[in-house]
């Protein structure tokens, strides 16, 4: 499980990105890169790192399910993810 501080930091960055999204888009469309550079670094969507929604793990993230491979495997074996079943061929 990820540290609580890292999970909180990611949420804070996501909030900052949402706050400045319209302003960033307008500045980019106008080509005003000097004003764009004055915005906070965390206002850029590139700074967001995807994390597991259950425990905050940053690696081995599956976008389709919003969780890491470890939690995906555990929940899939338990039959708790709709539409997912063990393959057999």
From Swiss-Prot:
Gene3D superfamilies: 30s Ribosomal Protein S14, Chain N (4.10.830.10). GO terms for molecular function: rRNA binding; structural constituent of ribosome. Keywords: Ribonucleoprotein, Ribosomal protein, RNA-binding, rRNA-binding. SUPFAM superfamilies: Glucocorticoid receptor-like (DNA-binding domain). GO terms for biological process: translation. GO terms for cellular component: cytoplasm; small ribosomal subunit. The keyword Ribosomal protein applies. It holds the Pfam family Ribosomal_S14. It comes from the Bacteria. Part of the 30S ribosomal subunit. Contacts proteins S3 and S10. HAMAP family: Ribosomal_uS14_1. Belongs to the universal ribosomal protein uS14 family. Binds 16S rRNA, required for the assembly of 30S particles and may also be responsible for determining the conformation of the 16S rRNA at the A site. This is Small ribosomal subunit protein uS14A.
